[in-house]
């Protein structure tokens, strides 16, 4: 759960999704090496105006933030689509996509990032995009055997 008051923050959150996706590839590589079953996860991202409320009990140290709004439920719904029915792990709503894609294109001018995403129509929870984006340097390190110098 991240608060994104600025458009640049939405890009940074998407970037974290790309790292999580790459991390899961590393973790599953380790599992395969030890003949363990792989883990499939869905990574959901949604952006919307939310209400954040602090809830707890006075004097007992319980003081948590609670997010109220569509972004949380949609992110959960999108995560449920990830790595299922032929979808890749990363699933993000159109608002998230629209607020980060220009920066992704700017940071990858020769790589056509818009082609990394597939658009899906969903009347229920809202349209979304799917992708299997990884951090290349991190992935190369995984493929090279995860050696620490």
Spell out what each predicted region is:
Residues 1-2, 51-56:
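Short acidic/His/Gly/Ser-rich catalytic and metal-binding motifs that mark active-site loops
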Residues 23, 27, 78-81, 85:
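Conserved, well-folded catalytic cores of nucleic-acid-processing
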Residues 3, 43-49, 94-96:
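A general secondary-structure junction signal
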Residues 34-53:
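A short glycine-enriched loop-to-beta-strand structural element that forms part of the catalytic core
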Residues 84-149:
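Intrinsically disordered, glycine/charged-rich C-terminal tails and inter-domain linkers
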Residues 35, 54-80:
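Catalytic-core segments of nucleotide cyclases and related cyclic-nucleotide turnover enzymes
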Residues 15, 40, 66-73, 91:
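Charged, alpha-helix-enriched surfaces in structured cytosolic catalytic cores
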